[in-house]
Amino acid sequence: GLLGSIGNAIGAFIANKLKP
């Protein structure tokens, strides 16, 4: 759902910040 999509987007954003 929408909430899951937002969670995935945030997770990817954090992952990119931690491991560019």
Swiss-Prot record:
One of its GO terms (biological process) is negative regulation of nitric-oxide synthase activity. One of its GO terms (molecular function) is nitric-oxide synthase regulator activity. Keywords: Amphibian defense peptide, Secreted. GO terms for cellular component: extracellular region. It is found in: Secreted. Its main location: secreted. This is Dahlein-5.1.
